[in-house]
Structure formats: structure tokens, C-alpha cells
Amino acid sequence: MNFSLTDIIMVIVVYSITFLIVGTLRFVGSRRRLSPMMIRDAIHIACGGTILLLPLFSDWFYPFLLPLGMAILILFGPSARRDEDIESPVVHGIDYSQAHSLGPLYYMISTAILIPLAWSKMTVVMAAVMIMAWGDGAASLVAPRIKRRHNYPFGGKSIEGSLLVFLLGFAGAIVAWTVGSLAGVSNVPTVRIVSVSFLGALAGCVAEAASIGPLRPFDNFTVPFSSALLMYLASS
């Protein structure tokens, strides 16, 4: 790996964008008196889009610094000690177990693992993170507010939530594969983008629905890893 000033600048830019998103949503949420969980879910969805900047980096190490740094901040930053900081809605949940309230940390860890692991197929990483961000994030934000949900007989998950994971994840994956194709980092023909995205979203949907019991707090691992594996195989 060679030192790259351009990549360092990109790291700073993406950090700045992330904190701007978090700060803006925190400000709007407080003005509108939204719950911390609603703000957290909105951040989950909005920040996922930064993964689409992955093709702008020349080596996996530089984008790897982004989730690594955010994970360290979540663990040891000011929000780990008090609730009034900008990151607090991301870390501290309501009616969540301690493991589930650390969902954003798992979000960062799974992204940090995927970046070096699938760097040769970085569009897989982009699509998997988008499925996690848009699909799982939308389900968490919208599904609990649907009055007439059709719950599965296990785990407290709903059909409506699964549909949201699939539909928004499918849209996010298509966006990621399209960006990858335009950036010249995807080997998937345009005509196959829909089918590969479909399989990735389906894998994420099934993984999210199956994340019950002890696995329920860890859907930020099960969803992106399942999606990434199937899309990696489907795009080979």
C-alpha cells in the first residue's frame, strides 16, 4: 500500500459527511421531538449511502479506517459516557437490550470486515451495506408503526417488516450495482444487475427474519454477510 494524499482527503471528506448527517438528523429530531430510536433508524438509513463512495479509494485500507474509527468512537467516545452528545441516538436505544443497543457498533464492524474481505469485488460490499442500511433500517423505522401487522409465530418479526427489508434492500442493491458499473469496478453486466440485486435482497430479507432469539440483536451481522455471500457467488 502506497501513501495517498487523495485517499486521506477522501477519508476526511466521508467523516465530515457522516458527522454532518448525524448532526443534522439529531437537530431535526430534537426540534420535532422524535424519539431517540426514530433518530437512530434515520441515521442508520442515511449514513449507509456513504458506502457508495468506495470506488473513489485506491486501496482497501483507507475506507477501512472509516468504520474502524466510528467503532472506536462508539466504544470510547463521549457518547459512551453520557447521552447528550451528537452520537447518543446512535448508541443508546429505548426498550433495547444492551446487545441490541450496540447495533450501530455491529454495523461498523460488519462493514470493516467486508471491505478488506471482498475488496476485489467492492460492489458486493457496497450492495450488502446498502441492503443493511436501507432494508433493515426501513424495517426498523416503519414496520413497528404499521397498525395491522401480520407477525410470524416466532421472534416478534412481521411479514410487513420482511417486505420492507426486501423492497428497500432491493432498491439499495440496484443503486450500488449501478454505481459500481458506472465507476468501472463491477464485472456484472447491466442485464444481470436486477437478478443479482434480487438475490442479495432476498438473502438479507431471510437473514433478518431468521435473526431471532439470541441472534436478534445481531442482524447487522447476519443481513450484510448473507447478502454479500450470495451476491459474491451470483456475480462470479
Q: Language-model features: where?
A:
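Glycine/aspartate-rich loop-and-adjacent alpha/beta segment that forms the canonical ThDP
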Residues: 17-21
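Selective transmembrane alpha-helices of multi-pass membrane proteins
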Residues: 69-72
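Interhelical loop and helix-boundary elements at the membrane-water interface
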Residues: 2-9, 23-64, 76-233
